[in-house]
Every structure is written in structure tokens, then in C-alpha cells.
Regions:
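Core alpha/beta structural scaffold of self-assembling particle/tube/pore-forming proteins
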Residues: 1-255
């Protein structure tokens, strides 16, 4: 496994340093704020990368977006949580696991977290001439010749089973995709989320696994809790001053 390095920057202006000449405490406060901000930025970057494939893409421009304007819409609206105002972006036709980024950058000046739109300081094609609908979006510096993003769950357990010629840290996992690249379970036509989780657990146990945790995004977890809530009978024999709704945690009893 190859280690990678991800960075965040903090800065204190010369003006701030000079202004605190007679008050060392104020300089310390300024430094602490910058360092805390950089640490938080690193934590956010790591949290995003933990579930990604090491390519570094934070989202994708929707097929219907017009890159000749300042505003584009994300293909997955929920990816809006990966962006912030002031962030400098690159784009590429690939997801970062291959290929190269397009020349140029754009800077986010506004975003709509409900509509899933990113607005740049100018037309996207003004900052990145070759930008196109369907391109993947990266924070500037995340898609370089030297990798800076960790290999998250999307890399260790890829959505598509590895095929011949695969090289994951030098290992061709196509010889036994389940043992070397995890289990991919398709729910087919769908169904209640609790049933899908139980079926997934059954498949994992069949392969000799001992699953201990299931990770859901907030929206899926909310739907899961609501589905379970409709099947719970609340004992009203004793009055409760502060009734509780929902669950602090959900323990799934699999095979």
C-alpha cells in the first residue's frame, strides 16, 4: 500500500502580525484560528475520500449543463456537500483514476445546496476552455501526476468487479474478485431497505465474512429509521414527560 499526502493551507497576513505587535495573545488567537481551519479542511477532505476510489473527483457536471455560462448543475445533487465558496476547481473527462485534468481552473463564487448548482466567477469555458458537460470536478491539486488522495472504499471494494489486468497496489484482483475486491450485491428491483440490508448480510456471511457495521448516508438512514418506526409498538402504559421518536442506533440481526 502506497502512502499519499493531502494538504491544507492556512495563512496569517503581515498586517495581522504587525497589528498584534503589542498584543501577543491576539496573534496566538489568529494562528489558532488558521490552524484549526486547516485541520478541519483536512478532516473534510479525508471524510470525502474515505468513500471514493482515489481519483479525487468531488462531483460531475450534469449532461444538461451549459458550461458556456457561470452556473452548472451537478449530476448528483447530493455531491454539493463536497464544495465550498472560494474553492478552486479543475475538471477532467475521467474520474481521476486515469487520464489527465483539463488546462485551467474556475473559482466558486456561489452555490445552491438545494438545487445542486455551482456558480463560478465567470463562464466555465472562460476558465477551462475544454470544459464539457459530463466532466468530473476536482478541487485544484487533487488530480495530479503524484496521487494525493487515499484509496477509499470505492477503490478497495469497487462497484464493478475487477477484470484481467487489474493492478491494485500491484495486485491483479481478477483471479478471485470476491476474496480480493469484496462483495457486490445487487438488490435487483429494489425493496425495503431493511430487507436489502439483511440480504446483503446473508451474502456476506455466505462468503465467510463477519459484517459488523453498515454505513448509510443521512437520507438513506432517515428512510431506514422511518421504515422501522412504522413497525414499532410504543408502550404507553407509563406517562413520559419527553417522548422519544426514532432510534439512537439500529442493530441489524443478520444470519
Amino acid at each position: 500500500v502506497t502512502r499519499v499526502k493531502d494538504y491544507a493551507f492556512g495563512q496569517v497576513t503581515t498586517e495581522a502580525i504587525r497589528a498584534s505587535k503589542n498584543d501577543a495573545g491576539s496573534l496566538v488567537d489568529g494562528l489558532k484560528e488558521e490552524v484549526d481551519g486547516a485541520i478541519y479542511t483536512c478532516m473534510r477532505s479525508l471524510a470525502i475520500a474515505m468513500f471514493k476510489n482515489s481519483g479525487g473527483a468531488r462531483g460531475q457536471i450534469s449532461a444538461g449543463s451549459n458550461v458556456g455560462t457561470p452556473t452548472i448543475t451537478l449530476a448528483n445533487v447530493s455531491d454539493i456537500v463536497n464544495f465550498e465558496v472560494g474553492m478552486i476547481l479543475n475538471v477532467s473527462a475521467t474520474d481521476g483514476t486515469s487520464g489527465a485534468k483539463r488546462a485551467g481552473t474556475v473559482t466558486i463564487t456561489a452555490l445552491d445546496r438545494d438545487a445542486g448548482t455551482l456558480t463560478a466567477s465567470g463562464n466555465w469555458t472562460a476558465g477551462i476552455a475544454a470544459a464539457a458537460a459530463g466532466d468530473f470536478i476536482f478541487q485544484n491539486g487533487d488530480f495530479e501526476a503524484t496521487k494525493s488522495m487515499i484509496s477509499g472504499l470505492g477503490a478497495w471494494i469497487p462497484t464493478t468487479a475487477p477484470t484481467g489486468g487489474d493492478s491494485f497496489f500491484g495486485l491483479d484482483r481478477s483471479s478471485d474478485t470476491t476474496r480480493l475486491a469484496g462483495v457486490r450485491y445487487s438488490a435487483g428491483s429494489g425493496g425495503p431497505i431493511e430487507e436489502i440490508l439483511i440480504d446483503t448480510a446473508a451474502r456476506l456471511v455466505r462468503e465467510g465474512s463477519k459484517p459488523s457495521h453498515a454505513f448509510l448516508n443521512p437520507l438513506d438512514y432517515a428512510n431506514f429509521v422511518k421504515a422501522l418506526g412504522s413497525k414499532v409498538i410504543y408502550d404507553r402504559a407509563s406517562p413520559v414527560d419527553e417522548p422519544s421518536i426514532g432510534f439512537e442506533a439500529v442493530k441489524l440481526m443478520g444470519p
